[in-house]
Structures are given as C-alpha cells and as structure tokens.
C-alpha cells in the first residue's frame, strides 16, 4: 500500500470525494482484477461492480448525483478504507493519459491540496509518489491494468507534476 498524502480525518471531513455527478462518471474508481477478487472474497455483492470494472454507484438519497457503493453517507466514511482500490488510495492524485503519455496530476478541487500545494510536505509527497509509480512493480501494474489510465480531459484544475514514459 502506498503512503498517503491526506490525513484520513481531514479527507473524511471534506464531503467532496466518493460522490459523482453522473452514474457513469470518469471519476468512478476502476478496479484491477485482484481488487475485484478481493471484494468478492470479502463477500461484496458482484452487483456493486460494473461490467466496466468500476464501482457501481447508487443515487444520492440526500440530493443530486451518485454515491460510491462503499461510502457510508451517515458517517461520511469509506466502508472498505483499509483495502480500498488503488485509485482511491491515489486520490487526490490522478493518473492521466494524454498524448500517449502517462501524466501524474493532482485535483485542485481537493481543499487540502489547495491549502498545501506550495508546502514542503506536498513536494516531498509528490517526489515519493513519482518514484513509487516509476518503480518496476508499479509500471507493470499500470501496463497490466490499462483501465487505470484515464483521459481526465475535463480536469481544468490539475497541476501536472511529472510525465513518465509509458514505455518503461
């Protein structure tokens, strides 16, 4: 498991993550085969996993949009936090595919990122994450799971941290 940038308590107070405007949002986490298997092994109903290998959201009972199937809206907590998918662990950082290059971006809609973007902590974590994602194990993981490489074209508020060649 990778180190986290956001303290869990800070993240859970935001109420921005795990919610989606559309049922088929590009922001829905994609799942790797081993993550799907772990969910099934933990007796998660297969109906919560879409045919596109994404977590199937449900209509937000408190308003507009959709909620991650594993998000407890009453407690504002992830039910599977300790074994959440890779993309959930990575957020607010995103692996973005542009012009056949893999770009590590960060979502500036995250208030913690906005507040800490210029901090030493942010720079150190970005360096750690770049090194982590460029390790042979992670490069193989990305090559074996192309569904994790998304074209987040609608992200206007993202900072490109580093481009690493997908052919490594």
Residue locations for each model-derived region?
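Short loop/turn segments that flank or connect secondary-structure elements
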Residues: 1-168
